[in-house]
Amino acid sequence: MPQFILLLRDDRAAVNGSSPEELQQLMYKYQDWRRTKATGGQKLMDGEGRVLQKQNGKPSVIDGPFAEAKEVVGGFFVIEAANYDEAVEAAKTCPHMEFGTIEVRQIEKT
């Protein structure tokens, strides 16, 4: 069955406005969702990251975090679905929709 990656982009303002209790409840929702829908996934480290880009023909590294971005990739899930429509329907049920966006991309078989 095809695999899809769900890239979870956090709206930092929404996350920062949540109480510790609300965040704990959200983590429980993530755990339940992952057990039933995902074949893999991880939360990414807060405040870490590097972007590589070519400058003057050579790789250049920019350190994160990227505070100027309204949304940052905060994690990902890998799911199996028959097609994009099914993957999108699964993504709609992800608790991440409460405070962020989800990009759905099919993983190419190698």
Where are these regions (language model features)?
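Conserved, structured core segments of small domains
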Residues: 1-110
